[in-house]
Amino acid sequence: MYLTYDERYWVVDVEGNSLEPDRIWVTVVRNVQTDEVIRLYNREDWAEFHKDYYIYVTHNGLCYDVPKALNPLWMAGINYNNVIDTMVLSQLYYPRIEDGHSLAAWGERFGLEKISFHDFSKLTDEMVTYCERDTEITAKVFRALINRLKQRGYSERSCEIEHKFRHIIAEQERNGWLFDKKAAIKLYRDLRQQEYDLGLEIKKKFPPWPKKVNEYKYRLKQDGTPYAYYQQHVDKYQIKWTSETTYETWEEVEFNIGSPAQRVDRLLDLGWKPTKFTKKTPKGGGGNPQVDEESLLEFAEESGIPEVSMIADWLVLNGRANMINTWLENLGDDSCIHGSVFTCGANSRRCTHSSPNTANIPSVKAKFGEECRSLWIARPDRFIVGIDAKSLEALLFAHFLGGQQQHIDYMMGDTHIMNKNAIEEQLGLESTKAQCKTAFYAYIFGAYPAKIGQTFGLDSNMGEKI
């Protein structure tokens, strides 16, 4: 069904009065095989067209055209099993494709420019033309994508699974998750107060340090007095003479826990070894150490240095408060959070989440994790049921290693500690569990030796050995 077409396949595109429509102005259907175009303006037109068995091809139709427009407003009776969504096929084909998966982007790729149209307050000839062009682009995208997916070896089953999953997730997005706003505001305020108080304590642990601002020439006016800027420097900075005619301005810098650069500098002084770095830019920038919560907490535990533990605790408080603030910003009028999910958003074909990132909620065992999770509540007379699968990627990896029982046993253990021990025994390298975890997932998702080596602060040659 998904990787073929015949005369039963029709592209469908709907134009309503908003993204949350209460009226459909026009629906255009286009036959994928014959290119026949039909315009439908009301429920009766649709009922006459829909009386035969058809398969409907849409672009984002599992999220908009069918659930928000046709089925609720025209009682279209479309079975989701008969819907093909080219947005899903596009993401499955190439999740991180340049310029994205929009119909406009695909139109550009095929030389079919999407018409610019913005007035959806009333039905116009321009709107109908706009809708027809969208069906033209969608039909071409569909025909191209099924050929490309077949060339890459995708099966009907894989397309079916992704469509069913997208349908379920779209329903999840529409329903949202009930959120305890009152408790969230209280927790947010408590965390911000703790963050502020701890920040003051940290500041006491790190005294100010001198920092050079600039170097200047000492110049005199004709009357023998110095220029005004010199007195301004004297009033504002410490002056260090480097010769009879030049001086440097210096100032004392107070530690600002909110500055990532200052945090990195102080932690490096305390012996912290970074495991993550910013991406390098084409112009040679980037590659700077990043402070991540997991590796810092591990270092705090290993080192026993109080200042490290304090910075780690401050980062947790800051991160949790920022996260709750984001949740509150995305809270709807229905007291629910309707987070967005791209079901094939990552190159690995895993989901990505936004507005807000609901996949990044701290676990119950993490600091303030239970308090954060308790904000997501069930509707009256409903219950929250939690389920998780352990080591899915590791089990898949074991399967491709051969699937023997010893591989499965190995992967079901603490994989990252085992890898840490193996690296130390076989290569003589000290490492952390966090580094080994990062390297393991990077490896199974296709990272090259340079990336593996970078995880441990090493070069690509060592990455190859690891």
Model-derived features: where do they sit?
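Metal-dependent catalytic core segments for phosphate chemistry
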Residues: 22-26, 386, 393-426
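Conserved "right-hand" nucleotidyltransferase catalytic core of DNA-directed polymerases
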Residues: 1-15, 20, 26, 126, ...
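Cytochrome P450 catalytic domain signature, combining two hallmark sequence patches
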Residues: 76-80, 196, 272-279, 401-413
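Short, basic (Lys/Arg/His-rich) helix/loop patches that form interaction surfaces
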Residues: 425-433
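Hydrophobic "anchor" residues on beta-strands that sit immediately upstream
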Residues: 9-11, 55-56, 81, 384
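Short, amphipathic alpha-helical "recognition" segments used to contact nucleic acids or chromatin
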Residues: 434-445
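Active-site-proximal helix-loop-helix substrate-binding element of RNase H-like nuclease domains
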Residues: 20-25, 29-41, 54-151, 159-169, ...
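Short amphipathic alpha-helix with an adjacent loop that forms part of the alpha/beta core around
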Residues: 44-51
